[in-house]
Regions:
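Phosphate-backbone recognition surface of nucleic-acid-processing proteins
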Residues: 91, 97, 101-182
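Long, charge-rich intrinsically disordered scaffolds of nucleic-acid metabolism proteins
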Residues: 1-88
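Short helix-capping/linker segments at secondary-structure and domain boundaries
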Residues: 1-2, 108-112, 161-167, 195-209
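Low-complexity, acidic/Ser/Thr- and charged residue-rich accessory regions of DNA metabolism proteins
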Residues: 134-138, 171-216
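Non-catalytic, well-ordered alpha-helical scaffold segments
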Residues: 18, 22-25, 29, 55, ...
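Short alpha-helical "patches" and their helix-cap loops
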Residues: 4-13, 115-122, 167-177, 203-216
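Short coil/turn segments at secondary-structure boundaries
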Residues: 5-6, 35-37, 75, 132-135, ...
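Short, solvent-exposed helix-loop connector elements
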Residues: 2-15, 43-46, 138-141, 170-187
Length: 216
């Protein structure tokens, strides 16, 4: 049994930066979306005033997000273990830098959550109830906000994966033509992405479809 290891300081920093990045995105969306919604019933002159007032804030929020992204990249690039894990994770089609960063944080750089089924359960995408001799509650439990971020990111990853020509796209289209519930099929794709991430990390080699078993 692997003993629990507290997150290294650099992982704690990544966690903080990731959370700040998410807040910036949320504030940006809160400010930008209402402006778009108002276009249908607000006069043109008022629209221009609102846009001018909000533009500087929106630009500042975007700049803040870019600055956070740069800090995250610098931390990962400056740490040998994190850089290696990051490169392995983003090699999986459909998995981007933000998802990889969140995975590193949530799993304590793949030390605390070493089982893909457990990660799927923590991320809220497991098509089953995970059970084992060790409770999923406790020191390895991911915070509620982190769970929401992971689930959202894996949803975006699945949406990206089904647009990429290959095994996952074929599987999604085949199941759809069979009349399967699209959300259930999409959830299976989310779960598959997690398993592929853990597979490449275990092998220590970037994604290669010839090494991995096909979707059921």
């Amino acid at each position: 049994m692997r003993l629990w290891e507290p997150p290294r300081q650099i992982v704690q920093q990544l966690s903080y930066l990731s959370a700040v990045r998410q807040r910036l995105i949320q504030v940006y969306n809160l400010l930008a979306v209402p402006l778009a919604e108002q276009e249908s019933f607000v006069s043109t002159s008022l629209q221009k005033k609102l846009q001018a007032t909000s533009k500087k804030s929106l630009v500042a929020l975007k700049d803040g997000q870019k600055a956070i992204d740069s800090q995250i990249s610098a931390l990962i690039d400056g740490d040998g273990r994190l850089k290696k894990l990051f490169e392995l994770i983003v090699s999986v089609p459909g998995v981007g830098p933000t998802t990889a960063t969140e995975m590193l944080v949530a799993s304590n750089e793949m030390k605390s959550i070493t089982d893909p089924k457990k990660m799927a359960c923590q991320a809220g995408v497991a098509p089953f109830v995970y059970s084992s001799g060790t409770s999923v509650r406790g020191k390895t439990r991911v915070s509620h906000q982190a769970q929401k971020r992971l689930k959202s990111l894996f949803h975006l990853g699945a949406m990206s994966a089904i647009r990429i020509k290959g095994e996952i796209q074929d599987h999604y289209q085949r199941k759809g033509s069979e009349g399967k519930n699209k959300m259930l099929v999409l959830n299976a794709v989310r779960n598959k992405l997690i398993h592929r991430i853990y597979a490449v990390v275990k092998r220590g080699e970037k994604y290669d479809k010839t090494y991995l078993s096909p979707l059921a």
